[in-house]
UniProtKB/Swiss-Prot annotation:
Motif extent (DXDD motif): 390-393
Comment text on domains: The Asp-Xaa-Asp-Asp (DXDD) motif is important for the catalytic activity in the class II active site relevant for the cyclization of GGPP. The Asp-Asp-Xaa-Xaa-Asp/Glu (DDXXD/E) motif is important for the catalytic activity in the class I active site, presumably through binding to Mg(2+).
Family that this chain belongs to: Belongs to the terpene synthase family. Tpsd subfamily.
Gene: TPS-LAS1
Binding locations of Mg(2+) 2: D609, D613
Organism (species): Pinus banksiana (Jack pine)
The EC number(s) this enzyme carries: 4.2.3.32, 4.2.3.18, 4.2.3.132, 5.5.1.12
Residues binding substrate, per UniProt: K257, K477
Chain positions of motif DDXXD motif: 609-613
Gene3D superfamilies with a match to the protein in the record: 1.50.10.160, Farnesyl Diphosphate Synthase, Terpene synthase, N-terminal domain
Protein name: Bifunctional levopimaradiene synthase, chloroplastic
Catalytic reactions of this protein: (2E,6E,10E)-geranylgeranyl diphosphate = (+)-copalyl diphosphate; (+)-copalyl diphosphate = abieta-7,13-diene + diphosphate; (+)-copalyl diphosphate = abieta-8(14),12-diene + diphosphate; (+)-copalyl diphosphate = neoabietadiene + diphosphate
Domain of life: Eukaryota
Length: 857
């Protein structure tokens, strides 16, 4: 009989956690009794680095013949980092105060009201567009403005420096454009001489700053409307520096752009040129252009463009649109309106990325129902009646609607792909922005099987975004954000399948700008998208949830210690890392019990994996499995001491879990839990048997067992009982062992594990992995080719997992999340290597710290 680990440790003291795995010399008889194994050791030093004992990195036990019997390589794990004293040292002083709870409730109410009050979109005044509307002469023929309140607004809203625009943010392009529009309007109406002179002085002294700004900050249509207005200003006799080099350059750009414009394109179909008709008045056929008027009477939602058309045509629908906008805003107009689809989609995206969406489920549903009711297979724009779709709103809509279960097709992206396979924001546009390409990239990761357009979008946008990170001038065509670079870096490093909600929330809290602005024809703000309330709630909520998580982790540490598991010398102690898993995705306070069950079950899968994988003899493993099957504590007397600790802890823990499950489900669940574990232990046993005889199965045989032995299904099937839902047998079957959903979770988890660990485990004597088994089936291919094929299988399975997650609506939402997020956490843990075993010197350690111990400021 093999010695228990305590005796092995007394022979050769390693000072670290160790594990034996079967390792046979090729000349040995594979049928040698599993009860007569010899042990070899690999040591970990105090610096957690492997100690090498010669070329083989092993050392034989004294007094044993190295060729007489099958051997074991004794695998050692680095000790756990998150010991009690480490956790205690990191405990912040933060506690949830009653005032915090009250403030959270207040903010939730205010944000709910914000969502419920959403109409056509809230935004700020545009001095530029207001100046164009103020030009309109009265329709009654009097020599007065049709909208005198807009003229008065211009007179009252000049800034101290003589410019017009947003006071808190200086963008030379925006200020110069708005100021030029306002002084022209005041000159036309022969009023505000003082304001005009101050505006001219501002223009003269500040226009040159445009040369210092990035081209990407140039507002939409600037090269069209700015030269046209300069021509007007010159005709009005305004004393401006018309000969400045940059002005001449912009005029040349305009001429070149107009020369490239096909004569009939302007009238063939709606394009972004409709947004800037005020700058094209000398070439527009006003009768033809009316065919492209939007249903609401506007031209691409632009008050300035619509005002110019009205002054040329007297079209009543144009006037109705302008009256509609002024009825909403009073004495000014924004740069475009409505913005109803844009506002709703970005507001939903904001609360989701900040991690506060769980407070606004009804509001989110209402917002998305509205967007979906205006969804178009050709794409959508920023407003429901916008005739020109854009990839930014379309990609955001496709991703969010799909993830919330709405039936939307990825074919919608084909509208925005040119003949070279590149993606663009608007039809006929060649320049792209970082924010729109970022949204397409985020969208591309929620692909379903066979959606080649999504794969093409992913590759195209990844290439663009990586180049953008190297080019500071690429930030950004459509927005001035606090840290768009940080958003891009996060998206590329943690794409959808490894972006856990708590980590994304932490990152976005740091990157989110409550004063972010967007770039249209002028700079504009969206207060229902960017505001301090979202950020304040996100910080308070994150710290509050984190406080509860720390308390739960301490409870689980006490369970671990009281169960005697810290005495086990053969297994990995990764309590904090394992608790981090459910805390990173099922983080809401109401799921505390589910997190505890998930963590305890996961810890047992690690203990028993290490036990069955290498430590126990086959006889003892079969005894352990039989004890679980019979649920018989008396059999423990026949076990070695460390296995006694395992089984007693297992037996007591799952009796407690079953009792709690009975209360929640209203029926006995112990037999269900037993059966879940029986299947799991059968998979472990099969792997142990394969290892004992160095059997390399076929790929299909291996995956059939390995997708179970990865143990994710066991964790999910038991934890699901505590998601707050009554789970009928029918529901359980939809996430059960025979379900495609659960299989894909196990498959992707197994494959990402194998791709990152097979080389190290092969060096330690393991003979079966997805890569090795595939190579056995296909001896003609190289290891590199086999690895590439396994990655392809995994990527395809992740796409299918997306579809199962989205379409499996018969399964309660929390159960769907449990399955899907468990698959995602595996992608995170194994993104760069074995993030569980080697968590002490990998990024997982920082994730644990940021998620559980570091409050946000």
């Amino acid at each position: 009989m093999a010695l228990p680990s305590s005796s092995l440790s007394s022979q050769i003291h390693t000072g670290a956690t160790t594990q034996c795995i079967p390792h046979f010399h090729g000349s040995l008889n594979a049928g040698t009794s599993a009860g007569k194994r010899r042990s070899l050791y690999l040591r970990w030093g105090k610096d957690n680095q492997a100690k090498k004992f010669g070329p083989s990195k092993i050392v034989a036990c004294a007094g044993q013949d190295p060729f007489s019997v099958p051997t074991l390589v004794k695998r050692e794990f680095p000790p756990g980092f998150w010991k009690d004293h480490v956790i205690e040292s990191l405990m912040p002083s933060y506690k949830v105060a009653p005032s915090d709870e009250k403030r959270i409730e207040t903010l939730i109410t205010e944000i709910k009201n914000m969502f419920r009050s959403m109409g056509y979109g809230e935004t700020n005044p545009s001095a530029y567009d207001t100046a164009w509307v103020a030009r309109i002469p009265a329709v009654d023929g009097s020599e007065k403005p049709q909208f005198p309140e807009t003229l008065e607004w211009i007179l009252q809203n000049q800034l101290k420096d003589g410019s017009w625009g947003e006071e808190f943010y200086f963008l030379a392009y925006d200020r110069i454009l708005a100021t030029l529009a306002c002084i022209i309007t005041l000159t036309i109406w022969q009023t505000g001489d003082t304001q005009v002179q101050k505006g001219i002085e501002f223009f003269k002294t500040q226009a040159g700053k445009i040369e210092e700004e990035a081209d990407s900050h140039r507002p939409s249509g600037f090269e069209i409307v700015f030269p046209a207005m300069l021509k007007e200003a010159k005709a009005l006799g305004l004393d401006l520096p018309y000969e400045l080099p940059f002005i001449q350059q912009i005029i040349e750009k305009r001429e070149a752009k107009l020369q490239r414009l096909p004569p009939d394109l302007l009238y063939a179909l709606p394009t972004t040129l409709l947004y800037s008709l005020e700058g094209l008045q000398e070439i527009v056929d006003w009768e033809k252009i009316m065919k492209l008027q939007s249903k609401d009477g506007s031209f691409l939602s632009s008050p300035a463009s619509t005002a110019a058309v009205f002054m040329r045509t007297g079209n009543k629908k144009c006037l109705e649109f302008l009256n509609f906008v002024l009825k909403k805003f009073g004495n000014h107009v924004p740069c475009h309106y409505p913005l109803d689809l844009f506002e709703r989609l970005w507001a939903v995206d904001t609360v989701e990325r900040l991690g506060i969406d769980h407070h606004f489920k009804e509001e989110i549903k209402d917002a998305l129902d509205y967007v979906y009711s205006h969804w178009d297979e050709r794409g959508i724009g920023w407003a429901r009646e916008n005739p020109v779709p854009d990839i930014d709103d379309t990609a955001m809509g496709l991703r969010i609607l799909r993830l919330h279960g709405y039936n939307v097709s990825s074919d919608v992206l084909k509208t925005f792909r040119d003949e070279n396979g590149e993606f663009f924001c608007f039809l006929g546009q060649t320049q792209r922005g970082v924010t729109d390409m970022l949204n397409v990239n985020r969208c591309s990761h929620v692909a379903f099987p066979g959606e080649t357009i999504m794969e093409e979008a992913k590759l195209c946008t990844e290439r663009y975004l990586r180049n953008a990170l190297e080019d500071t001038g690429a930030f950004d065509k459509w927005a001035l954000k606090k840290n768009i670079r940080g958003e891009v870096e996060y998206a590329l490093k943690y794409p959808w399948h490894r972006s856990m909600p708590r980590l994304e929330a932490r990152s976005y809290i740091e990157n989110y700008g409550p004063n972010d602005v967007w770039l249209g024809k002028t700079m504009y703000m969206m207060p229902n998208i960017s505001n301090e309330k979202y950020l304040e709630l996100a910080k308070l909520d994150f710290n509050r949830v984190q406080f509860f998580h720390r308390q739960e982790l301490q409870d689980i540490r006490r369970w671990w210690n009281s169960s005697g598991f810290s005495q086990l010398g053969f297994t990995r102690e990764r309590v904090a890392e394992i608790y981090f898993s459910p805390a990173s995705f099922l983080f809401e306070p109401e799921f505390a019990t589910c997190r505890a069950v998930y963590t305890k079950t996961s810890n047992f899968t690690v203990i028993l994996d290490d036990l069955y994988d290498a430590h126990g003899t086959l006889d003892n493993l079969k005894l352990f499995s039989e004890s679980v099957k019979r649920w018989d504590l008396s059999l423990v007397d026949q076990m070695p001491q460390d296995m006694k600790i395992c089984f007693k802890g297992f037996y007591n823990t799952f009796n407690e879990i079953a009792e709690e499950g009975r209360k929640r489900q209203g029926r006995d669940v112990l037999s269900y839990i037993q059966k879940v574990w029986e299947v799991q232990l059968e998979a472990y046993t099969k792997e142990a048997e394969w290892s004992a005889v160095r059997y390399v199965p076929s790929y299909d045989e291996y995956i059939g067992n390995a997708s179970v032995s990865i143990a994710l299904g066991t964790v999910v099937l038991i934890s699901a009982l505590f998601t707050g839902e009554i789970l009928t047998d029918d529901i359980l079957s939809k996430i059960g062992r025979d379900s495609r959903f659960l299989y894909l979770m196990g498959l992707t988890g197994r494959l990402v594990n194998d791709t990152k660990t097979y080389q190290a485990e092969r060096g330690q004597g393991e003979v079966a992995s997805a890569v090795q088994c595939y190579m056995k089936d296909h001896p003609e291919i190289s290891e590199e080719e086999a690895l590439k094929h396994v990655y392809t299988i995994m990527d395809n399975a992740l796409d299918e997992l997306n579809r199962e997650f989205v379409n499996n609506r018969d399964v309660p939402d929390t159960c769907r999340r449990l399955v899907f997020e468990t698959a995602r956490i595996m992608q995170l843990f194994y993104m760069d290597g074995d993030g569980l075993t080697l968590s002490h010197n990998m990024e997982i350690k920082e994730h644990v710290k940021n998620c559980l111990f570091q409050p946000v400021a």
